[in-house]
């Protein structure tokens, strides 16, 4: 079964996280976002993964954001995907 990782991180971390994920062959969609939790200057990354890829993707995100020494780290959600259609 697939999972959808939704990661909301400061803009200054977004390129590094996207690059680290794509280097490991994960597909990433970036959306500019603003919200009440982290305020402005955020990006939302959407990453669809198979169950067996989940831990690797989460580790890549965590290591990349932690290495940035950013004060605002971000927030992450993992959602079960019932159906995935690629066209």
What is each of the regions a protein language model found here?
Residues 1-87:
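Positively charged, small/polar-rich N-terminal and surface patches that mediate targeting and assembly
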